[in-house]
Each structure stands twice: as C-alpha cells, then as structure tokens.
Amino acid sequence: MRRTAIEQLYRWKESTDRKPLIVQGARQVGKTWLMQAFAKEAYAKCAYVNFEDNEMLRHLFDNDFDIERILTSIGLATGVNVDTETLIILDEIQEASRGITALKYFREKAPQYHVMAAGSLLGIAMHHNDSFPVGKVDFMNLYPLSFFEFLDAVGETQ
C-alpha cells in the first residue's frame, strides 16, 4: 500500500532545517503504519518506542532531558544502536510524562537526529502537564485513506 503522505515524510527527512515531527491524526488512521513503512523504506535503522505499551519508558523524561541518556535508554529498550542514521519513532507520545516537551530538546541540543512522534489529536491536545514546544517541532496531519489510496490498497485502478 502507498500513502500519498509518505512524500511529505521524504521532504521532512531531506529538509536542511528539520525539526522533530509530530504526526497527528484521529485514532486508527494509520499513523504508526505510515511511520514504520517510511522507516523501512528510507532508513537503515529504526528505534521504535510505543509509550502506551512500555510502562518503564513512560518515565524516560521525568528527571531531565539529557539527550545522551535518552538515546542510550531508547537504544537499550529497542536493541538498536541509535545514531544519526536512525529514525527514532516515539509513538503514543502523549502517554510519556513530559514527552512532548522533550521534543524541544532534540531540536535544540541534537538536531542531527531524525525524530518522529505520534499520538491521537485528542491525546496531544489534552496533555496539560507538558509545556508545548512552539516553534521547535513540525506537524503533519494524517487523514484516513483517500478514495484513490483505497483503490490502490485493494489492487483496483478505477
């Protein structure tokens, strides 16, 4: 299956002013699928963290925003040696304490890393405990399959 949104991800990857990217969208529109498909297609390595499924990592940002410590923890949890050629996916980021705020520090202290985050629109919007990293992240809205994407997915042309 091919989503037209993947072209936006390629532009993000190649941007000289790349910021952490938050992929927003309603539940079940394919945010996780799109990020993982893009990782397989465009990166040699992917460190995927789902904060909804990993109780321990939900507290990754509780004490500080030390990027080296964070990257080491992600590497240990995922089994991936994280470097600047790795796509770091932080899924269901609204479940991590101070997770959205942490994206600011990737932009300020480690812009060489490729970081994507995702969460439901409602979950991100209602996450009151975080200070929002205005100007430090980019956003991409993902919508359900278009009619043409659906036709392509089921192998039809018309």
Place the predicted regions along the sequence by residue.
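Phosphate-binding site recognition
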Residues: 1-158
